[in-house]
């Protein structure tokens, strides 16, 4: 189980990313449309003035049951060992067990 503070930090980042998503997208479009380099720098400065945690690259995918940040499967939103336990318990329809 991940620490609660890390999970809350990740939720805070998700909220910031959603809040600034359209602002960042519009600034990026402006940068691509402006031909002069000085204007691009000014717009880039505006983009940099937004909070760091509003950038989508800073988001980290976590297991929604345990909060584990590694070995996550996008299709299920679960970490590897939780996914394996659920498949062995027949809780995921359509998934087959594998043992080696």
UniProtKB/Swiss-Prot annotation:
Keyword tags: Chloroplast, Plastid, Ribonucleoprotein, Ribosomal protein, RNA-binding, rRNA-binding
> Where is the chain membrane-spanning?
none
Query: Which GO molecular-function terms appear in the entry?
Result: rRNA binding; structural constituent of ribosome
Q: Pfam families in the record, alphabetically? A: Ribosomal_S14
UniProt xrefs under Gene3D superfamilies: 1.10.287.1480
Is Transferase found in the keyword set?
no
* Single Gene Ontology BP annotation: translation
Which PROSITE patterns would you find in this protein's record? RIBOSOMAL_S14 (PS00527)
Taxonomically, the superkingdom here is Eukaryota
The record's subcellular location field reads: Plastid, Chloroplast
GO CC terms, sorted: chloroplast; small ribosomal subunit
User: What role is this protein assigned?
Assistant: Binds 16S rRNA, required for the assembly of 30S particles.
Entry's family note: Belongs to the universal ribosomal protein uS14 family.
Q: Which HAMAP family match?
A: Ribosomal_uS14_1 (MF_00537)
Q: How does it assemble?
A: Part of the 30S ribosomal subunit.
Q: Which NCBIfam families match?
A: PRK08881.1
> What is the name of this protein?
Small ribosomal subunit protein uS14c
Gene field: rps14
């Amino acid at each position: 189980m991940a620490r609660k503070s890390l999970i809350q930090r990740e939720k805070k980042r998700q909220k910031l990313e959603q809040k600034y998503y359209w602002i960042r997208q519009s600034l990026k479009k402006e940068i691509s449309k402006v031909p002069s380099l000085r204007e691009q720098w000014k717009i880039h400065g505006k983009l940099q003035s937004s909070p760091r945690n509003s950038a989508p690259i800073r988001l980290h995918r976590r297991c929604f049951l345990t909060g584990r940040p590694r070995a996550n499967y996008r299709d299920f939103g679960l970490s590897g060992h939780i996914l394996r336990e659920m498949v062995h318990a027949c809780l995921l329809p359509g998934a087959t067990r594998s043992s080696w």
